[in-house]
């Protein structure tokens, strides 16, 4: 038995508001173990709404509607559903009384508000404690259940939790859970990741699906089980296989971030880090200090755009700076060592590069970045990165910051 989410509203089609209701409902259905394979957005047009309903009835047994329950002429969900299933509408006295009470505190009840008291004959009221528009629970024919909710997210969510979920569970929905775990990777393209774990992706249970987001690759492992504990038992061996195959390119799972992983590693070792930034404008320091308790591991940073600051504050050799240029492996290494020494930290990390749009040459294009890491043992490494400048300055700065975090993470793991 599968569900389908149908969101009604021309404003959604025009992109005027974000369709967060569909995201919430999809997550809720997964947590209840109710499969759903389709989501539809349709405008405030009765003909098109009916076409959507006709298609949905052929492929789902639970239809969940949001939007179109208000008092205005373009709020058409209830009457369109009643018309589609050839069921008359009736005014519910209890809804009308509730509307009159609520509107008394909102400037008075008007005749147009009466339409919100109409439901198809046989439908059950789905109360709305926060707003004026009630929803309904309706089974217009055997084997089909319809739930309707207002489009206001806060109202919909409370109605879902308080009334819809208990109803669905009482009807035998939600006997299983659909549980997912997302593994996160940095430093490996999605296509290469998919090739390396092709055997795991080919399995049907658990399913493994690759995707990319904000420069990182991810694998979503999904399983259906009787409860979360069983789901985790099924996922664990698959996750272990993937981690063994991929190695250090897998940096975490679910809500982990590169900055959070670095922070945890530093705190476990009781070590500190300082940063020197030339093209990221403090972005690396911001990421490291976004987390609570960052003063335990973050000493501070130097934003050194001018060459004289690189020399006077970070100890970069002026002759080498002149010869190699500010954007070079040698300068990145000296910046990392300089900030580590100057701020008396265990680790030093530096970024120097050309974020664009200006400052580039044929030899040093936009997107050329060097990242340096000074280790506690005195060793200093630097790495060259060439990012595409076509996505703009902010993208180069973002990738520079993320790769600096990743390079530090890898060094923390291989230099315990």
UniProtKB/Swiss-Prot annotation:
- What is the protein's species of origin? Thermosynechococcus vestitus (strain NIES-2133 / IAM M-273 / BP-1)
What SUPFAM superfamilies does this protein map onto?
CinA-like (SSF142433), Molybdenum cofactor biosynthesis proteins (SSF53218)
Taxonomic superkingdom: Bacteria
Q: Which SMART domains match?
A: MoCF_biosynth
What CDD domains does the record point to? cinA
UniProt-recorded name of the protein: CinA-like protein
Family, similarity comment: Belongs to the CinA family.
């Amino acid at each position: 038995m599968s569900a389908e989410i149908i969101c009604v509203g021309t404003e959604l089609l025009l992109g005027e508001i974000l369709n967060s209701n569909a995201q919430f409902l999809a997550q809720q259905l997964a947590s209840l173990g109710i499969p759903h394979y389709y989501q539809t957005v349709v405008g405030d047009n009765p003909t098109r709404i009916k076409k959507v309903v006709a298609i949905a009835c052929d492929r789902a047994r639970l239809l969940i509607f949001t939007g179109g329950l208000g008092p205005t002429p373009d709020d058409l969900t209830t009457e369109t559903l009643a018309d589609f299933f050839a069921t008359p509408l009736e005014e519910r006295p209890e809804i009308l009384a509730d509307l009159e009470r609520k509107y008394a505190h909102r400037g008075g009840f008007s005749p147009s508000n009466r339409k919100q008291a109409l439901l198809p004959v046989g439908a059950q009221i789905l109360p709305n404690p926060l707003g004026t528009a009630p929803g309904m629970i309706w089974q217009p024919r055997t084997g089909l259940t319809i739930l309707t909710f207002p489009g206001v997210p806060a109202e919909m969510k409370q109605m879902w939790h308080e009334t819809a979920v208990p109803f669905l569970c009482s009807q035998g929905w939600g006997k299983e859970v659909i549980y997912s775990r997302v593994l996160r990777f940095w430093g490996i393209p999605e296509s290469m990741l998919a090739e390396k774990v092709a055997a795991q992706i080919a399995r049907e249970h658990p399913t493994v699906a690759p995707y990319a987001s904000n420069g990182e690759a991810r694998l979503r492992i999904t399983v259906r089980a009787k409860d979360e504990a069983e789901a985790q038992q099924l996922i664990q061996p698959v996750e272990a296989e993937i981690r063994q195959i991929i190695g250090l390119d897998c940096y975490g799972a679910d809500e982990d971030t590169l900055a959070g992983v670095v922070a945890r590693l530093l705190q476990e070792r009781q070590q500190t880090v300082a940063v020197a930034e030339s093209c990221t404008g403090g972005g690396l320091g911001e990421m490291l200090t976004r987390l609570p308790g960052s003063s335990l591991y973050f000493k501070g940073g130097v934003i050194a755009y001018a060459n004289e600051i690189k020399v006077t504050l970070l100890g970069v050799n002026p002759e080498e700076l002149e010869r190699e240029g500010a954007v070079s492996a040698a300068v990145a290494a000296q910046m990392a060592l300089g900030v580590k020494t100057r701020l008396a930290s265990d680790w030093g990390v530096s970024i120097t590069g050309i974020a664009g749009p200006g400052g580039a040459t044929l030899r040093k294009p936009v997107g050329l970045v060097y990242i340096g890491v000074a280790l506690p043992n005195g060793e200093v490494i630097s790495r060259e990165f060439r990012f595409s400048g076509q996505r703009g300055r902010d993208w180069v700065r973002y990738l520079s910051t993320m790769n600096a975090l990743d390079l530090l993470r890898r060094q923390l793991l291989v230099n315990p």
